[in-house]
Amino acid sequence: MTEWSVWPAPAKINLFLHVLGRRADGYHELQTAFQLLGYGDRIWLRPRVDGRVERCSHLPGVAAEDDLTVRAARALQAATGSAGGVDIHVDKRLPAGGGVGGGSSDAATVLVALNHLWQTGLDEEALAGIGLALGADVPVFVRGRSAWGEGVGEQLRPMPVDPAGSRWYLVVDPGASISTAEVFGAPELTRDTSPITIPDLRAGAVRNDCEPVVRSRWPAVAEALEWLGRHGQARMSGTGSCCFVGFPGEAEAQAALERLPGAWSGFVAQAVERSPLHLTLAEAARTG
């Protein structure tokens, strides 16, 4: 029987999120910066020859047919005509629906890894296109670099880690269940922020336009931001519920994590320019 292989599915945080307006198709025009982190879920894959896609792990509240990892594998089959199948096991370490890209990153990892394991030969552009049909955040994980994002977040430009900025992040999940649809549908949401440039980000002239809505409707997020604010400039990632604060070094971030209130969960992770997934892919290609 073919052996299992393990592939990383890294987290992301949104260093800012500006809502520029609403598009004719109902989606919102956004600007954001995706910062990839060196921590995330782990995806175990075992190719099979019968063409079946089987989920071997349980994700509470998500049927196998709706699981993004299963959908990603089947989307790759449909796009390439591959007869390959796969068993999928997800070691879930990122909070579901937390704004750190857990499900999107898992889907991207399945696409990238199976493209290698099944030898389907798609390039990055084609994989990103398949990913976009699964979710707006999937392409940034497929491309595997921290990036400046526009459109609905799918228009990407690689963005280096700021050498003068934070290198380590404490990410906190206060456990709130945020409805992204409710946030973007809120009448009080700011929808007319002016476009900015990367130098504006470096200067700190940024915010998360969704944060005031989430603060007012989900008090747990407001409490987490207040607590993190004691350690630096606290921000919310995406539409939450995860919030974060940056540190220059790992020791400072770990010290703050140790003081985390018991009702919350969190992790410390390093900012990375290149995804751990792509480093794993390069090693797999090198060793055959």
Swiss-Prot record:
Q: Which gene encodes it?
A: ispE
Q: What keywords are assigned to this protein?
A: ATP-binding, Isoprene biosynthesis, Kinase, Nucleotide-binding, Transferase
Where does this protein hold ATP?
95-105
Is Glycosyltransferase there in the keyword field? Answer: no
Cite the EC number: 2.7.1.148
Instruction: Quote the NCBIfam families the UniProt record gives.
Output: ispE
Pfam family, any one: GHMP_kinases_N
Tell me the organism.
Halorhodospira halophila (strain DSM 244 / SL1) (Ectothiorhodospira halophila (strain DSM 244 / SL1))
Q: Which domain of life is it from?
A: Bacteria
Primary role: Catalyzes the phosphorylation of the position 2 hydroxy group of 4-diphosphocytidyl-2C-methyl-D-erythritol.
GO terms assigned for molecular function: 4-(cytidine 5'-diphospho)-2-C-methyl-D-erythritol kinase activity; ATP binding
Q: Which pathway, metabolic or otherwise, does it act in? A: Isoprenoid biosynthesis; isopentenyl diphosphate biosynthesis via DXP pathway; isopentenyl diphosphate from 1-deoxy-D-xylulose 5-phosphate: step 3/6
Please give the name of this protein: 4-diphosphocytidyl-2-C-methyl-D-erythritol kinase
What residues make up the catalytic site?
Answer: 12, 137
